[in-house]
Swiss-Prot record:
It comes from Bos taurus. It comes from the Eukaryota. Disulfide bonds: none annotated. Homodimer. Interacts with GPR89; the interaction stabilizes GPR89. Interacts with RAP1GDS1. GTP binds at residues 16-21, 148-150, 179-180. This is Rab-like protein 3. Required for KRAS signaling regulation and modulation of cell proliferation. Regulator of KRAS prenylation, and probably prenylation of other small GTPases. Required for lymphocyte development and function. Not required for myeloid cell development. SMART domains: RAB (SM00175). Keywords: GTP-binding, Nucleotide-binding. The keyword Lyase does not apply. GO terms for molecular function: GTP binding; GTPase activity; protein homodimerization activity. Belongs to the small GTPase superfamily. Rab family. InterPro entries: P-loop_NTPase (IPR027417). The gene is RABL3. One of its GO terms (biological process) is B cell differentiation.
Amino acid sequence: MASLDRVKVLVLGDSGVGKSSLVHLLCQNQVLGNPSWTVGCSVDVRVHDYKEGTPEEKTYYIELWDVGGSVGSASSVKSTRAVFYNSVNGIILVHDLTNKKSSQNLYRWSLEALNRDLVPTGVLVTNGDYDREQFADNQIPLLVIGTKLDQIHENKRHEVLTRTAFLAEDFNAEEINLDCTNPRYLAAGSSNAVKLSRFFDKVIEKRYFLRDGNQIPGFPDRKRFGGGTLKSLHYD
């Protein structure tokens, strides 16, 4: 297979929210049979057709970096984890729809990844305390994905999805809610698949067509997989 240009997308969120299952579904188009805790970082690759169906169509590698650990980790752990945040082109924030704390912690994950966890006292963890000015100048494309949609009782679904809609709005991001054990949520032509493709297109545009310093500062184009593993590819 010919070498392709690539972009790096972080997949962040609390342990147990289903990041590994999500990445496997995105890259292999299959349900992950035996999910396990991610230690360090695991890297999988998806092949994406930018502007599919247009004269500008071009194929890219999307590197999905599944970062393990807890957002409340000691500073030494955060320092070690920071190596994975170099030269990032996009961020997928993952939370468990049945666990409100995992949603609140996305603010802390995003601040950590964007190297802004040393500003203001009292890390922001709730929608009510969130200051959008913190991200006013952020140019890194974000996508919010809620997992375990199947575990929300029907009479609670409206309440939960209304709350998560505000969460995505805070990040100026689109949201996708799904069940990682059911591939139909990302079926070709579905609204979720369209949102996902639009996000990847935006990441590619920021990386290759808008050269104005939008990346997180780091080592330009250096591939640092750390303890991660490079796995097989999935075509859109």
